[in-house]
Amino acid sequence: MEECSCDNRFRRGNNEPAGFSLDEQWWAGNIRLVDLSGQLLGAHIAHAGLIAFWAGSITVLEVARYVPDVPFYEQGLGLLPHLATLGFGIGPDGTVVDTYPYFVIGILHLVTSAVLGAGGLFHTFKGPAILAEGGALAPKFHYDWGDTKQLSLILGHHLLLLGILCLAFVAKAMFWGGVYDASLGTVHTVSPNLNPADIFGYVFGFNHGQFNGLGMSSVDNLPDIIGGHVYIGILELIGGTWHILTKPFAIGAKPFSFSGEAILSYSLGAVGWMGLLSGFFVRYCDAAYPPQFYGPERSGAAAVQYILGVLLLVGHVWHATRARAGGEPVPYTPPAPQRGRFGMTRVAPAPARTFIGRGKPQPEPPKKKGLFGRG
């Protein structure tokens, strides 16, 4: 079997938007991996490792510089308030009595980042560039952007994971030590409010029957917050199971594009919308962001959420426009095996492609002639 050059592992794909040239775009990132399911998986895992490394390292750094007699928000700490809100390290009177749990959580994130980083490196340099060409179970996880069934399967697993994590937060609040209650200034377990009229009323701007323009961010008690997470977790588990077992209906899938850039635009739109919503929670919801930890004035932190949300929505429009102009995705076709010398089977080499940072397709290096003029 012929060897594949290192550059060919990052070869340009068939599903890049029309008019796009990697040679002319210095900011091109993972779009060069759009047709390489194995390489894109490696980038995805490595990205998760970077996020875990950031969270772990910043947590350990904040523990090292924490001053007990000064509130979190006056020290400019960003992650310890979140851990304190979850009830870690807080005494009966609502003050921080132990920072060791914060240190342990930071170290666990660093260990997790090392594992994820190793996985990202494996899939980048050792694993198959395209999962369909790998051995063992790798082909089972290959996907094409035009294969709506496989994409629905991937979405379903993501929803299942989110649902499990959401219900884990509920279990922490109900059984595993409780969470911090800003109204009482203590940590205690919470019994969720499961009244659907109360919980879903927030979606339409009603706080227990009274209209409030702040909508969901007007929630002012922990039972409603935990009850809302119960419903969200259950809905995500149902949605995840649904998407794993089904594929998009023709009438529902028709208005949508399923190219890589289109799915990126959908993700950016969802995260951007959540960024705008979270800004209202940061600014106005003391039950979710206790002023004892985050400060009574949180407009600056909320402004950061608004700015990031708007930037992500702009990215959504940008990538959605490019996806609409790019046409339908091209399905993956595995290379056809060819019969070589002595009846041995070899895989046909990949066609010449434009590599990142190169202006033209790179020709094959000339073969050196050996003894008697043989190649």
From Swiss-Prot:
Pfam family, one: PSII
Gene Ontology CC: photosystem I; photosystem II; plasma membrane-derived thylakoid membrane
Topology within the bilayer: Multi-pass membrane protein
Compartments where found: Cellular thylakoid membrane
UniProt main location, coarse: membrane
InterPro entries listed in its UniProt record: PS_antenna-like, PS_II_antenna-like_sf
Annotated segments matching region Disordered: 352-375
UniProt keyword annotations, A-Z: Chlorophyll, Chromophore, Membrane, Photosynthesis, Photosystem I, Photosystem II, Thylakoid, Transmembrane, Transmembrane helix
GO molecular function: chlorophyll binding
Coiled-coil ranges (or none): none
Residue intervals passing through the bilayer: 40-60, 102-122, 151-171, 225-245, 262-282, 300-320
Cofactor note: Chlorophyll a.
GO annotation, biological process: photosynthetic electron transport chain
Top-level taxonomic group: Bacteria
Cofactor(s) essential for the protein: chlorophyll a; chlorophyll b
Family: Belongs to the PsbB/PsbC family. IsiA/Pcb subfamily.
Role played: The antenna complex functions as a light receptor, it captures and delivers excitation energy to photosystems II and I. The Prochlorales pcb genes are not related to higher plant LHCs.
Subunit structure: The antenna complex consists of chlorophylls (a and b) and chlorophyll a/b binding proteins.
The name this protein goes by in its record: Chlorophyll a/b light-harvesting protein PcbC
Taxonomic source organism: Prochlorothrix hollandica
